[in-house]
């Protein structure tokens, strides 16, 4: 389980290692995460090391090695482990990554698609499904596949190891079916909506979190209705 700051720091270290071949300095990490002191970076580094995501090499300055990434990779640049690439759009003045076409701001805006925000989705304990359109977000078309799409605000931390954080906007492709391994919007008993990985287990359906603090839910098919598949994330920094 990673907190938002731990996830952001791990991603920053990994991206810097790929770009420059060396990890960032503690001052650079502090500035990147908008922290006031380096003591906060020390705590985050220690937490990442204890969880097995990084390793500090002894007797070497600025020597940090990334051992593993959360389940879907944190930089969005490569293939995923299980069929979903967590394409992330940075809100406001951020860059679009990794697949959106990049041109002038005006051209990019003209090509964007208005995706309706339909409420909130639980990445944790299921919450009551909300089906009221509140506003729209502007999404590059390369982030979306065919068919209809909508967005839901993520609430909870049960999918953090898949790179899905509390407060993210989940981009959902409407679909009433899913393949095993897909991350889906599942409606349980027509009352509760949750964002989980979908798997079939014999005659039952398993809704799996990406956080060891949460349990897998095993339900009969008549209690679960698929409402869409996750295709991307919109995140504000």
Swiss-Prot record:
DNA-binding region: 26-46
Gene Ontology BP, a term: proteolysis
EC number: 3.4.21.88
Keywords: Autocatalytic cleavage, DNA damage, DNA repair, DNA replication, DNA-binding, Hydrolase, Repressor, SOS response, Transcription, Transcription regulation
InterPro entries according to UniProt: LexA (IPR006200), LexA-like (IPR039418), LexA/Signal_pep-like_sf (IPR036286), LexA_DNA-bd_dom (IPR006199), LexA_repressor (IPR050077), Peptidase_S24_LexA (IPR006197), Peptidase_S24_S26A/B/C (IPR015927), WH-like_DNA-bd_sf (IPR036388)
Family listed: Belongs to the peptidase S24 family.
Subunit structure comment from the entry: Homodimer.
Full protein name: LexA repressor
Organism annotation: Rhodopseudomonas palustris (strain BisA53)
Taxonomic lineage from the root: Bacteria, Pseudomonadati, Pseudomonadota, Alphaproteobacteria, Hyphomicrobiales
